[in-house]
Amino acid sequence: MQYIFHLVLFIFCVQISLAQEKSFGGLQDWQLQSLHSSSTRSISSLAGIWEISYDGKNWYKSTVPSAIKDAKKLYYRRTFDLTEEERQNNSWQLLFLGIEEEIEVSINQIYVRQYIGGMSPFYIQLPDKMLKSGKNLLEIVVSKPSQGFYKFKQQYEFSPSTYCGIPRDPVLIGTPSLWISGFKSTQSFSNNYTNAAINTNVSISSATLEKLGRLRSDSTKKTSAVFDKMSASVQIEVKHPDGQILTNVVSPQTIEILPERTLSIPISFQIPNPQLWSVESPNLYTITVKIIQNSITIDELTYPLGLRELKVGPDKKQLFMNGKPLFIKGLTYFEEYGLKTGITVSPNLLEQDVKNLKLLGANAIKLQGKAPNPYLIHLCDKYGILIFVDLDVFDMPSSIVSSSEMQIEMQNSIERYITAYERNPSIVAWGIGEGLEESASSTGKYTKDFSAFVKQRSSKLLYRTIRFGANAPNSDNSQLDFYIFRSTRQVSDNIDREIKEVKRIEKSFEGKPLIFLFGKLVQTNNKNGYSDPLSAEAQAKYLRDFYKLIKSGTYAGLVVWSYNDYSIRRPIFTTNSPDASKIATSGLVDVFRNTRLSYTMIQALFNEERDPLLRAGTYSESMPIGFVVLGLVATFAFLFMISRLRRFREYVVRALLRPYNFYADIRDQRILSLSQTVVLGIFISLTVGLILSAFLYFARTNNDVDFLFSLIIPWNEVKEFVDNLIWNSTISIISISIITMVLFYAFAVFLRLIAILFAKRVLFYDTFIIIVWSCLPLLFILPLAAVLVKIVTSTFSLMIITTLLVALFVWLFYRILRASAVVFDVDSFKIYAIGGGSIVLSLAVIMMYYSYEYGFVSFFYYVQTTSF
């Protein structure tokens, strides 16, 4: 009895778990109808339980849609049923609402083909000969591209996490043998928006001759022999937002089509006194396209139609919607929820987000990096939210922007976007790049060529997002409609500096509307008051100050980064949040939609209400005690040894003033104290630890330094360890000191190998002495290293001290080579050649590897030229 009870309990828990997983994805039938409305088609969501495998051998059950963070390759399979009538009378397609990676599709163990997802919706035609009545096995292999442009386009700062899987619903669609395969529309207005001219292009596709013959037989109620063409009429039915059908608007078009062909039919009509779509009144007409033969509707499909016009105003400073100025109040939005479900977001949650955006007073969202979810677009059409869609070109060096692979990738992406989204009224603009090198000629050429490519295919506006500090506009930007400027996103913001930059931008970039993108990271659960730059109050204050700055000028709008927190590909150290190092905490709400103080602030600002009071707090930054304590202890210990140990004092004097004699003694086997050498090495290592830790502590809130660290340290676990060290100065000093001591031993081993090359009887003990005592001059900056964290307070002081330290380390390297020549008793030129050549060769190999794998040289130069 107890066994049965536990079994029932287990089954119940599994069902609850599956139901909870299901709640994060999977469109209900009525939601699916809002995306693909037809009474003549079989439309079935394939969301539900699938089999999934990491290797194609070991399978387990899981839900679809779903995606797994950082997975490289996944195998999916499930079956679906077709009756004999369904198989014979319909043509079957798979509709994927969004897959980011490459996929391979097989039906009944027969390979169909490979497709590239890109997260935009796409159809896969299932060949008739591969289908059978009864159960059909659908197999999908999803894999991430690992080479080329895909690898580099994920490198940018705050790049969202990558997922592998099927994050949005797959849909099985059965169409008649003659079906509507595409619909495009453009619109224009006249007589002060009292008349709308609609130009449409309807695509009609046909199946095989056998299926067309069967369709003709059904429609005529007579058996038909083999024929060449099929005749039908195409009709368009327009429904007013109030539900009434507009009569005598569109005339039917007669077509004749051959088997396995696609026709494009242009159909134009006018709507008098249209009800316009706007953010305040999102009025939606519907267009139902029908294929009719012998008074029988063969196929029909319904599309939304929002009549609106968004263009640049006559003053070239504002955007006008339907003839009226529109100030953009937007937020960047990331389709992600929680830490487990990731980019698989339930339709109900998407709708709740859109409703919250309206309550905030927002009228636009900016989507970064991924093609929008069709259901999200449907909701924005319904509720009146404008969408700015960014292509996946972010913070990219000019050498990558100019590559042919990148150009082809972007052209393919925008064509898929236009096919999927061009007819939606909420989609108003395409972003063709963010954070590019404005001074590079390749950026101008890319903008000119790609803008022309898009303008030929789309009626949407075009823009680029430009980093603060960029040069004057390139002449090749003429086809852009407006600019978005992105603030620094630094934790330690300087609002006065950004005020000056906004004014400079206004003068330098005249002639186009300007929108400003700004935001600030916050430390989770930090409520210390805005005196702490990582606090929730500091985020709210920054957003308030920047908002009022933009509202005080004649600008086209603003976009806040961001509505919600989102997971990122690489850990960051700028927020000192070990529990959230891989989350961009820039949101007004966190990943679970819990609101922050900045949510209340933006709601008040967007709705022109009284903004909430902010608490300053008593936070003040102080120098970490670890620098002073460890620095002073090491300094006094070193001075104590010099004053009390005569032999040690003599070694120090001779190593500094008479290095040749000092190392000649080593060559002649005059033994130095090993214990004193080890202690000296500890002091020197501690000095290096103090210096490097001071630099890291100074740069702990700098995004550019964090980005370079992400390039240098490509392993997330190691990067997280280093990030934690940066904020814990004592552990950082000790860790770097230990690493330095280990390097002393490693270099000593290397010198021992060089000695073997020269056939010299030099022991490891001797090479260790060479390394340690050659670095002796470092100890004389030990007192400076103890207080260096207080001296390095600006980029200018950092550059001066860095230059001096580089010169010092070059001198130390020279001392090591000179000492090696003396101890090895060989010509100095040979040692210099081998030592210098080894360093150059090692650096060259490392740089070649990093450049090939991560584009390090290109990205390093990019950071240098775009930093503000």
Question: Whereabouts are the PLM-identified features?
Answer:
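Hydrophobic alpha-helical transmembrane segments and adjacent short intramembrane/lumenal linkers
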Residues: 722-738, 747-855
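Accessory carbohydrate-binding/adhesion or oligomerization-edge regions at the termini
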Residues: 16-69, 141, 145, 241-243
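Active-site-adjacent substrate/metal-binding segments within catalytic domains
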Residues: 66-68, 73-82, 90-95, 100-104, ...
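Extended acidic/polar, glycine-enriched regions
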Residues: 133-135, 224, 228-313
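Accessory beta-strand-rich segments of carbohydrate-active enzymes
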Residues: 21-25, 36-37, 71, 76-181, ...
